């Protein structure tokens, strides 16, 4: 048997649930709008970034399918697996859209190379693999990375679609 208190509890729970849903949807919409504004602003800023210049005839292809071209051959130290390096970069999709750039942030990326802290295409393109000669400090290289050496079918962060071929302009700044 139900009494009036049960009906009040049901109404109160329904009201609380509806209030929570409204707050969640409003919050999610606000976050989405802010994110969209950020990426729209970032994308327009990225559009100004220059690309490394090279001739298609300079592109070499490794057994993995990765293509690369040295725009500037460095004269400094070559990093070894596990060493920390600093590298500036701009990442683009094949349609030319820039998705990330350390140049835009004004600070090079610092990471240990060759230990999977970055995508395999970066490790191979910087250290050298499958006939690719390793980079030296001061070097600038274009890497065209197939999906298997990038983010694969999963893509990344809603910014890089699944199965995307990626183009990176990479400048090896320092071996630390």
What kind of feature is each model-predicted range?
Residues 2-176:
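Cross-family detector of peptidyl-prolyl cis-trans isomerase
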């Amino acid at each position: 048997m139900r009494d009036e208190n049960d009906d009040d509890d049901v109404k109160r729970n329904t009201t609380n649930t509806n209030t929570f849903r409204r707050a969640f949807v409003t919050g999610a919409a606000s976050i989405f709008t802010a994110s969209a504004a950020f990426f729209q602003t970032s994308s327009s800023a990225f559009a100004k970034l220059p690309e490394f210049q090279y001739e298609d005839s300079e592109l070499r292809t490794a057994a993995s399918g990765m293509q690369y071209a040295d725009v500037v051959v460095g004269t400094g130290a070559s990093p070894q697996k596990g060493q920390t390096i600093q590298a500036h970069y701009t990442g683009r999709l094949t349609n030319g859209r820039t998705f990330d750039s350390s140049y835009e942030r004004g600070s090079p990326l610092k990471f240990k190379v060759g230990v999977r802290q970055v995508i395999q295409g970066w490790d191979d393109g910087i250290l050298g693999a499958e006939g690719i000669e390793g980079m030296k400090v001061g070097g600038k290289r274009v890497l065209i990375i197939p999906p298997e050496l990038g983010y694969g079918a999963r893509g990344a962060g809603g910014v890089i679609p699944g199965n995307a071929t990626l183009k990176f302009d990479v400048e090896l700044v320092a071996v630390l």
